[in-house]
Amino acid sequence: MSILVKMPLNLAFLNFNAANKIKKNFPDVKNWYIGGHSNGGQFAAVHVSKYYKDYKGLILLASISSFKDLSKIDIKALSIIGSEDGIVKMDIYKRYKKNLPKDLTEYIIPGGCHSYFGMYGLQKKDGTSNITNVEQIEFAADKISEFIN
């Protein structure tokens, strides 16, 4: 089961603890993962910094953990970013990678960009992708499935 949470104004920081309510609505679910794309991933990381014992893993898509240092938290993490991401540039990603949990699985999608983790069109200032939107989503979905299973 996957649950997508609609954020107010599409901004995760306006409701980054929404997962607590969702977990209460599904008490039979024992293995929770949390994640997000871009700022959604950043605020999933903020949430995990406080509630890490509630989760099996953290999934970051074109995202960083610049607000919280998760390196000492006992949780596994998956980070996927495109090599052509123009929003979370590689130097920024590498600078904040040290904040991610030690149990980190990382993939850099050759030719992938920031916008292609979704189907919302291209963001201003994003890089030029060398793969299709569908190829990037399929790559990410496969890696997430492997990570969870």
What is each stretch, according to the model?
Residues 8-29, 34, 46:
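Alpha/beta-hydrolase active-site loop
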Residues 41-52:
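Short glycine-enriched nucleophile-adjacent loop
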